[in-house]
């Protein structure tokens, strides 16, 4: 069922949304089949562009620091059901144009890093690229959410180059350490189980686990710095020894 252009379109959509189940709303969003598929294809292209940028940065930094700052990169395209639900919840029309204009998180790239400092180094290098435009930045590492959630979120705009045009597309990029990602994944599974009541002691335990996760990140990063310092000193000592034991010039 496709919505027609008319002065009553908004009222008709609100009426439909108040009665349709989520699956049918999803079908409604996809009623503009070809334009919808094209738009999702553009978002997939944008995700590939961003993922490639981080793979290149990871390769460069691994040569510079002798380790990979990126543990893994995950991408996801928002499902039709989630798109429809978000448009409905925010009171936006169910159109392809509305998706592109009003939603920033259709395309998502999650970068899992070894240490918190890697997050900021990668984010800074990424944002310095001249074809990346920062639209929004939310630092939940410096200022965690009340439940303990930590991550760095960026909304960026990047071009994709098609055979006959260039399109600017928005992508949400999330940066987490391994422990941040582990906590967020398990918190989601625990909190969003069906029919689970809001339990204060569960929330407290989750928050305490988030604090422990943050402490673990800090301790592991401290150990990494100690190891790097020791390795640098050992390398300097070996170079000095080589110079002292070198052949004498007569």
Functional labels for PLM-detected ranges:
Residues 60, 65-106:
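A glycine-rich, hydrophobic loop/mini-helix early in the fold
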Residues 42, 46-53, 65-66, 70, ...:
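A cross-family "folded-core" feature that marks the main globular domain of proteins
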Residues 100, 113-222:
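Long beta-strand-rich cores associated with HINT superfamily self-processing modules
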Residues 8, 15-19, 40-42, 69-75, ...:
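Glycine-rich, low-complexity intrinsically disordered segments
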Residues 41, 45, 78, 82, ...:
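Charged, alpha-helix-enriched surfaces in structured cytosolic catalytic cores
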Residues 2-47, 54-60, 172-250:
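An acidic, glycine-/histidine-flanked metal-binding catalytic module
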Residues 106-113:
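Terminal, regulation- and interaction-focused segments at domain boundaries
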């Amino acid at each position: 069922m496709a919505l027609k252009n008319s002065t009553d379109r908004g009222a008709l959509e609100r009426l439909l949304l108040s009665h349709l189940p989520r699956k049918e709303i999803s079908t409604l969003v996809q009623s503009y089949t070809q334009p919808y598929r094209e738009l999702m294809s553009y978002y997939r292209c944008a995700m590939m562009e961003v993922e490639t940028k981080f793979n290149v940065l990871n390769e460069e930094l691994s040569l510079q620091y002798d380790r990979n700052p990126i543990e893994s990169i995950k991408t996801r395209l928002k499902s039709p059901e989630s798109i429809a639900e978000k448009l409905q919840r925010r009171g936006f029309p169910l159109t392809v144009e509305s998706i592109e204009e009003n939603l920033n998180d259709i395309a998502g790239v999650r970068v899992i890093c070894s240490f918190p400092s890697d997050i900021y180094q990668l984010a800074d290098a990424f944002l310095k690229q001249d074809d990346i435009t920062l639209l929004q930045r939310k630092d939940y590492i410096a200022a965690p959410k009340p439940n303990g959630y930590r991550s760095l979120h960026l909304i960026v705009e990047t071009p994709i180059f098609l055979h006959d045009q260039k399109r600017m597309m928005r992508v949400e990029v999330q940066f987490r350490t391994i422990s941040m990602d582990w906590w967020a994944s398990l918190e989601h599974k625990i909190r969003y189980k069906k029919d689970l009541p809001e339990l204060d002691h569960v929330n407290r335990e989750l928050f305490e686990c988030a604090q422990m996760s943050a402490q673990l990140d800090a301790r592991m990063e401290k150990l990494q710095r100690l190891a790097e310092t020791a390795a640098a000193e050992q390398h300097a000592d070996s170079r000095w020894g080589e110079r002292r034991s070198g052949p004498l010039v007569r």
